[in-house]
């Protein structure tokens, strides 16, 4: 025995009861009584009609003891060492004070700045030595040994 549900009120429809309404887009609506069919055809909202199941669900009527708070399980992330840093190093960095963190950051920044300046000086010196050596300016293609440009022979 198949028990259907009223499309408007949400009530049960037992075999031999109710009517079917098939809309133009072939969607089927089942109604328990002419009352629910009439309200549906008037385009009434079942959430606003006090005796419908949808109204009772919306306004939390009836079944209150069944509702219990859903408990979500939170995944706990295990802290472990990664490549290049052991667990001890990670814990030490995590527990470091902001002052020490800022000091080490400043120290590393200073060291990087000095390295950059030394590299710039080295490049400058290399360029100066190259210019001092003199020598003719040769295009890169000429230096690579590319084919010489063909001279015009018509004149």
From Swiss-Prot:
The protein's matches in CDD domains, at most eight in alphabetical order, are given as: Ribosomal_L24e_L24
One GO BP on record is:
cytoplasmic translation
> Where do Basic and acidic residues bias regions lie?
93-123
For this UniProt entry, what's an example GO CC term? Answer: cytosolic large ribosomal subunit
Acyltransferase as UniProt keyword = no
- Annotated InterPro entries: L24e/L24_sf, Ribosomal_eL24, Ribosomal_eL24-rel_N, Ribosomal_eL24_CS
Any GO molecular function? mRNA binding
PROSITE patterns per UniProt: RIBOSOMAL_L24E
Q: Would I find Ribosomal protein among this entry's keywords?
A: yes
**Residue numbers spanned by region Disordered:** 93-155
Q: Which UniProt keywords apply?
A: Ribonucleoprotein, Ribosomal protein
Q: Which PANTHER family match?
A: 60S RIBOSOMAL PROTEIN L24 (PTHR10792), RIBOSOMAL PROTEIN L24 (PTHR10792:SF1)
The similarity comment for this entry is:
Belongs to the eukaryotic ribosomal protein eL24 family.
- What is the official name of this protein in its record? Large ribosomal subunit protein eL24
């Amino acid at each position: 025995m198949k028990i259907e549900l009223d499309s408007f009120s949400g009530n049960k429809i037992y075999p031999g009861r109710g009517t079917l309404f098939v809309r133009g887009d072939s969607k089927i609506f089942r109604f328990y009584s002419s009352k629910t069919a009439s309200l549906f055809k008037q385009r009434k909202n079942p959430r606003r009609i006090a005796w419908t199941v949808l109204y009772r669900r919306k306004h939390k009527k009836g079944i209150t003891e069944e509702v219990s708070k859903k408990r979500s399980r939170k995944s706990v992330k295990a802290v472990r060492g990664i490549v290049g840093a052991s667990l001890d190093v990670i814990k030490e960095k995590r527990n470091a004070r902001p002052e020490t963190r800022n000091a080490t950051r400043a120290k590393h920044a200073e060291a990087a700045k000095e390295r950059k300046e030394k590299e710039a000086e080295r490049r400058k010196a290399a360029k100066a030595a190259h210019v001092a050596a003199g020598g003719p300016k040769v295009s890169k293609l000429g230096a690579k040994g590319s084919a010489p440009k063909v001279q015009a022979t018509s004149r």
